[in-house]
Structures are given as C-alpha cells and as structure tokens.
C-alpha cells in the first residue's frame, strides 16, 4: 500500500476526529463549520450560506420590569399544539448528507420535541396529488408554482388543511386565501434576491390573521425567530441548519440544532419581557431602513 493510498483511506477518520463534541457547539454557525468538515466541497456547497442582511436591520425594543420566570414557547397550528414555533422544513434527499437521512431527522426532532414536515414529493404531478395523499397526513404542504384551477380542485377533493409555500407578495397571499388555503409559508423559494422576512410585515398586514403565516429563509438564531414572530409569523421552518446537524452528527446533531434554537428563543423572549410567543408584536421590534 502506498503512502497516498493509506492517507486516502484514513481521511474520513481524520475528518471525524476534527469534529468538536456536539455538546460544545454554541450556535448553528459552528454547526455549519462541522458540516463543512464532514462533507465533500460539492455536497457542502449545496447547503452552505445564508443572507443575514435583512435580519441585521431589525432590532428589539424590550420591555423592562416584566416577570419572565415562567416562559411558554408553545404554539398551536391547525388544531395541533407544538412545543415551540420552530418546525423542521420539508427536506429533499437528506440521505445525500448522512446515511441515516430521514430516520435521523425524525429521531433528532423527536428528542427535541420538534415537529417535522414530511419530505417533499416533487415528482407527483398536480393532477395526481389528490390521489397521492398519505392516509396519516394531517396537513398538505404544497410548493409554488401552481395553477389556481388545480388548487381549487384539490381544495374540493380534501378536507385537510392546505398550506402553500412560495408566497412573497400580499396580493398572492390574498389570492391563495380566496382559493381556500388554510396557511401560507412566506418563502423566497428559487428567488434568492428577495428576503422572506422583509416582505413578512406587508403580507401580515394584508392577511390580518385570516390564516397562520409560516416563514423560512436564513433563520439561524433564536433572535431571528423572535423577530419573525413579532412581525406576524406563527412559526418558522428550519432547513439548512438541520441538514448541517445531520451531516456532522446524525440524529444527535439535528437534536442539538433544534434545542439550541429553542433555548435561544426562550432567552431572547425573557430579555424582551415576553412570557409567550403570542405576546410578540411589531411593537417589540424596529426595522431600520436602508
């Protein structure tokens, strides 16, 4: 065996040795670094990066002299009570980043008491969606683009709540509600030049609590999540950080990411004088314009 061959065989073990113990990581940015050590450059490139500019322009306006010894992070969506307004986003092909894939995500999320939105099935044509609904499904999550006629047909075919992802304008949100959707995910899906949290206030004002608003897009800290709650979101979907945790540590990494975000959210709520997520309103934040 040549020296080069021996080094190549040892490379995965050497990489694993460079990973910091998962319990010592303090935020999702460090988890991203661990994922980079674990994955090939091409694989890591698929899930790397974020756009933090919009979050940096939002600051908190805390309330003082409020007793926050007892915090309640729970939130209710579509008749179900959730431990925190932090959900695992639909993630396609997680086994690309870890051999345990979806199983590890489910295990890690369960340990963190977090809800997982099932993986997307992008190969199902719209005309077949109504016949492809799993019997155990509680909510249908659909990703734009879609035709209004198809959405109306699906609405007539099922009594399940329908949530659409990919809404970025107040007009699109109102149109979706008119077509019978029960929830909206504000998402810059395939439109990276637009920040989800930047359009959240206008959509929240237009929707006016007719349906719950969920949101995704570069959420990396508990403070990011609290900003979204204050601006009108009911919950936040976490995608890439979950994949970072999965890639680096499997189920334990997924658990760590979600529990870190939950802990950060609780801390930031207490610092702002908030006892429940429902108390977060626009009065608790300030948006600094460009």
Predicted regions and their residues:
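Alpha/beta enzyme core
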Residues: 131, 144-215, 226-227, 231-234, ...
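An N-cap/entry alpha-helix motif that binds or orients negatively charged groups
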Residues: 19-82, 278-281, 286-290
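C-terminal helical cap(s) of enzyme catalytic domains, especially alpha/beta-barrels
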Residues: 202, 247-265
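N-terminal secretory signal peptides and thylakoid transit peptides that target proteins
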Residues: 1-12
């Amino acid at each position: 065996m040549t020296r080069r061959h021996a080094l190549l065989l040892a490379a995965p073990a050497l990489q694993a040795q460079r990973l910091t113990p998962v319990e010592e990581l303090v935020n999702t940015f460090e988890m991203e670094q661990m994922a980079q050590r674990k994955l090939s450059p091409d694989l890591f490139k698929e899930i790397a990066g974020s756009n933090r500019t919009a979050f940096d322009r939002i600051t908190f306006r805390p309330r003082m002299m409020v007793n926050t010894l007892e915090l309640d992070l729970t939130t209710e969506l579509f008749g179900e009570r959730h431990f925190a307004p932090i959900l695992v986003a639909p993630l396609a092909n997680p086994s690309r980043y870890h051999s345990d894939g979806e199983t590890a995500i489910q295990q890690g999320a369960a340990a963190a008491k977090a809800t997982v939105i099932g993986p997307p099935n992008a190969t199902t044509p719209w005309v077949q969606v109504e016949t492809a609904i799993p019997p155990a499904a509680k909510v249908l999550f659909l990703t734009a683009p879609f035709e209004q006629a198809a959405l109306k047909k699906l609405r007539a075919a099922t009594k399940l709540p329908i949530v659409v992802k990919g809404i970025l304008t107040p007009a699109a949100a109102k149109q979706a509600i008119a077509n019978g959707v029960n929830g909206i995910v504000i998402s810059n899906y395939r439109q990276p030049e637009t920040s989800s949290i930047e359009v959240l206030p206008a959509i929240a004002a237009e929707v006016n609590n007719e349906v719950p608003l969920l949101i995704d897009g570069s959420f990396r800290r508990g403070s990011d999540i609290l900003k979204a709650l204050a601006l009108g979101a009911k919950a936040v979907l976490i995608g890439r950080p979950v994949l970072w945790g999965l890639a680096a540590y499997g189920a334990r990494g997924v658990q760590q990411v979600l529990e870190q975000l939950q802990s950060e959210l609780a801390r930031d709520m207490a610092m702002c004088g908030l006892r429940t997520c429902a108390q977060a309103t626009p009065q608790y934040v300030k948006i600094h314009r460009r």
